[in-house]
């Protein structure tokens, strides 16, 4: 609608680059859940602003077109004041006349987003883009919200929570939680142990409580919200009884713990243990826990894998099922396992893929199977049987004697040979020891080549540190 000839109104549309961006569900001010494009701290926000005239062929006078990236905190008890902690602006067009539809690209490179979006009972933190066509009387604006998640690293210290509480000479209980810091899809595992019971308890429950604090001083507001509640015991316990606890966090709408965000608000989480007796009296104990957001997939995994593969090589002759299978022990582990197995000389040869190697597989993660196999191919000992007590020292004399004399036959009780064979990835292809055939010239050359890579005494100290450096990351520090 024209008003005293000041120009024609238009529609504004903000389109983001990168359709592959993930979306996240964020609760709005009215309580409804909305899907928004998801960005992380340090990511570039780019796209274009499309301006469409309502009446083609008309003219729109403006004083400039701009776009802003804004981070804002809104306190519901002080709606007149919006606290902006981030504001970036870029001019898209100079003042002039717009006579046709136009598109203006924008780019905010590597924007710092230090806080995560949050919508609570008394406060709201949001990030949005605002495109504005500046006019003399009233501006034309368009706002589009985005979701921002802040990823945290694994906590260096994550001690369990253990505490003894109760009423003197009436009730003494000891509760324990496996950790004090949990990621948003973690599982809380713990137990309740009754040391003294002299009152009649009817049931016991555990609840997850969110405490939101806004403002400071006399204008501080506290809001408590029960996120989840579980009944973990029904009936009267006895002395010495232990009640297990297992709570899955993935099914609830949780946020990371926020402490003094821009000196405006805080969000904390507590585990509330409640006991109720037959007279409906309640006994409770609250314990604070820390929640943090873990990445779905490590963002640095690709670069780390490429860097490690520069120093490691997967043999071309390796069968595909062996490359993707469990890793064999490294040099240090294979020498230990050989000496251990050689003590059981009277037993049968060790079958490939023993329980000793399988028990180590659960301790490793993040590293790809190709990296584990390449390391165990480079570090695995040769197939030639050697005495376990001097497996390194006699490696060179054995190589010289194998050329002049035929290789000795392997007996069933040769424990060192069986242990060394099972430690090699080649032996994992079969489930029985190799047949006892005459040594051909080809097998001598193969045996000679394999013995030449056997480490000597002075090289053992140099090999063992490399094995430790390239080992997989323990799951406990993942």
Swiss-Prot record:
Annotated spans, Disordered: 298-478
An MF annotation (GO) of this entry: cargo receptor activity
Keyword Lyase: no
Annotated keywords: Cytoplasm, Membrane, Protein transport, Transport, Wnt signaling pathway
InterPro entries in the record: Arrestin-like_C, Vps26-related
Compartments where found: Cytoplasm; Membrane
Record note on disruption phenotype: Accumulation of wg in the Golgi, preventing wg from being secreted from the cells.
Domain of life, source organism: Eukaryota
The protein's assembly and partners: Component of the retromer complex, composed of Vps26 and Vps35.
Protein name: Vacuolar protein sorting-associated protein 26
Species this protein is from: Drosophila melanogaster (Fruit fly)
Primary gene name: Vps26
């Amino acid at each position: 609608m024209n008003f005293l000839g000041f120009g024609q109104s238009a529609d504004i549309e903000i389109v983001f680059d990168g359709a592959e961006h993930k979306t996240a569900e964020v609760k709005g001010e009215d309580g409804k859940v909305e899907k928004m494009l998801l960005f992380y701290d340090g990511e570039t926000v780019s796209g274009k602003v499309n301006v469409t005239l309502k009446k083609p062929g008309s003219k729109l006078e403006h004083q400039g077109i701009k776009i802003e990236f804004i981070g804002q905190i809104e306190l519901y008890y002080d709606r007149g004041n919006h606290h902006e902690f981030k504001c970036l602006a870029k001019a898209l067009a100079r003042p002039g006349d717009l006579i046709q539809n136009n598109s203006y690209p924008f780019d905010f490179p590597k924007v710092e987003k230090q806080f995560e979006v949050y919508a609570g009972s008394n406060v709201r933190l949001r990030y949005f883009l605002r495109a504005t066509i500046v006019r003399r009387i009233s501006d034309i604006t368009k706002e589009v919200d985005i979701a921002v998640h802040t990823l945290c690293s694994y906590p260096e210290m994550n001690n369990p929570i253990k505490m003894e509480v109760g009423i003197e000479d009436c009730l003494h209980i000891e509760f324990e939680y496996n950790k004090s810091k949990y990621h948003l899809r973690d599982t809380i595992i713990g137990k309740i142990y009754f040391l003294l019971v002299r009152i009649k308890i009817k049931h016991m429950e555990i609840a997850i409580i969110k405490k939101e604090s806004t403002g400071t001083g006399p204008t501080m507001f506290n809001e408590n919200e029960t996120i989840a509640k579980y009944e973990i015991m029904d009936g009267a316990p006895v002395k010495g009884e232990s009640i297990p606890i297992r709570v899955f966090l993935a099914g609830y709408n949780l946020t990371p713990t926020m402490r003094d965000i821009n000196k405006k608000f805080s969000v904390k989480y507590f585990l509330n243990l409640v006991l109720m007796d037959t007279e409906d009296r309640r006994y409770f104990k609250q314990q604070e826990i820390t929640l943090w957001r873990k990445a779905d997939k490590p963002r640095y995994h690709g670069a780390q894998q490429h860097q490690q593969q520069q120093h490691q090589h997967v043999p071309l002759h390796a069968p595909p099922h062996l490359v993707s299978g469990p890793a064999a022990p490294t040099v240090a582990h294979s020498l230990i396992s050989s000496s251990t197995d050689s003590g059981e000389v009277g037993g049968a040869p060790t079958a490939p893929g023993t329980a000793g190697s399988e028990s180590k597989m659960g301790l490793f993660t993040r590293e790809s199977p190709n990296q584990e196999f390449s390391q165990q191919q480079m570090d695995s000992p040769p197939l030639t049987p050697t005495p376990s007590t001097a497996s390194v020292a006699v490696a060179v004399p054995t190589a010289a004697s194998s050329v002049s004399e035929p290789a000795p036959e392997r007996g069933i009780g040769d424990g060192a040979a069986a242990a060394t064979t099972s430690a090699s990835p080649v032996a994992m292809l079969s489930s029985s020891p190799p047949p006892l055939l005459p040594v051909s010239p080809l097998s001598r050359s193969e045996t000679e080549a394999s013995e030449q890579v056997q480490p000597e005494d002075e090289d053992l100290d140099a090999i063992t540190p490399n094995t430790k450096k390239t080992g997989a990351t323990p799951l406990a520090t993942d």
